Design a protein with these regions (language model features):
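N-terminal pre-domain/capping segments
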Residues: 1-113, 119-125, 160, 261-269
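Active-site acidic/histidine proton-transfer and metal-coordination neighborhood
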Residues: 12, 95-177, 182-186, 254-255
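Hydrophobic faces of well-ordered beta-strands that scaffold small-molecule active sites
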Residues: 18-25, 72-74, 103-107, 126-128, ...
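Active-site beta-loop-alpha junctions enriched in small/polar residues
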Residues: 25-27, 75-79, 108-110, 131, ...
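Gly/Pro-rich active-site loop or hairpin
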Residues: 37, 42-53, 181-239, 247-255
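Generic structural signal for well-ordered alpha-helices
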Residues: 57, 61-62, 89-93, 111-115, ...
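Structured loop/turn residues at beta-strand edges in well-structured enzyme cores
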Residues: 67-70, 101, 121, 171, ...
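Extended hydrophobic secondary-structure segments
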Residues: 69-82, 169-184, 190
């Protein structure tokens, strides 16, 4: 492919923002009645893959659209390489279209298989782990497939550690800032954002109650400095998407989706 898949602006519904997306990983606990422990994420992933057929995907998309979101970032478990094919991809895309949702990102691990899924669904970027690939291998695959990759911070505590994963970044490799994980690591989100500068190509907006753990909470009610992070993103000229992320272990994230969307849209206004 000559260039990256497009990510054109959406026509906003009243009261919505075309730059705000719903991360479907928010529904990690859906298969266990919205109760789970973060340490068992892998088990939830497997159960979600098994539970997500076309009917289940349709219900998920309908519920997301009902909260006013127009865009989604699809968690790998909802469109997993082990079960997806071109035909299924076309079905998933048709369901998204039916509910007025645009897939703007894929949250998962970089591989030829996940890049292919992005092609089927019209997704321009993968945000997550570089997997077993070297930066050179990753850039070559992304260039060939026309889909970008952004490494998401989890253990990293500063920009140097993050940029090392993508060998400083390039046209195809960048950074996805996860404000919640920076809060968990006790890092300064604004400082990391400033240091990464134009290599920040995507953002997961999440808040956590305290450093040292990953207990998510309402935006602006935790320690992740989300308002300051957004202000810094504006200051460096970031114009990409803001994916709202909240993977609660003991509640249904749909209950707070509208509140958090409104808060985020107000910050971006």
């Amino acid at each position: 492919m000559a260039g990256a898949l497009g990510c054109s602006p959406l026509k906003s519904r009243p009261g919505s923002s075309a730059r705000v997306a719903f991360v479907t990983a928010n529904l990690v606990a859906r298969v266990s009645d919205y109760r789970f422990e973060m340490a068992h994420w892998g088990d939830q992933h497997k159960k979600t893959v098994a539970a997500t057929d076309a009917a289940a995907w349709g219900v998920i998309c309908r519920e997301i659209a009902a909260t006013g979101f127009q865009a989604v970032e699809i968690w790998e478990a909802h469109a997993a390489p082990e079960v997806m094919n071109r035909e299924r991809g076309a079905t998933w895309k048709a369901i998204l279209d039916e509910h007025g949702l645009k897939a703007i990102g894929y949250g998962g691990s970089l591989s030829r298989q996940t890049l292919e899924i992005c092609q089927w669904l019209g997704i321009p970027q993968i945000n997550g782990s570089i997997g077993d690939n070297t930066p050179g291998q990753a850039a070559a695959m992304c260039r060939e497939m026309g889909v970008r990759f952004n490494v998401e911070n989890h253990p990293q505590k500063n920009a140097g550690e993050l940029l090392k994963v993508v060998d400083g970044g390039n046209d195809w490799l960048g950074v996805c800032i996860d404000t919640g994980w920076l809060g968990t690591q006790g890092a300064s989100g604004p400082e990391v954002i400033r240091a990464c500068g134009p290599l920040v190509r995507h953002v997961h907006i999440k808040d956590v109650k305290a450093a040292g753990a990953h207990e998510t909470c309402m935006l602006a009610e935790g320690v992740a400095q989300v308002a300051a992070c957004i202000a810094t993103l504006k200051a460096i000229g970031y114009s990409g998407w803001y994916s709202w992320e909240d993977e609660p272990e003991d509640r249904n994230p749909f209950d707070s989706a509208v509140r958090n969307r409104h808060w985020l849209e107000k910050q971006l206004a």
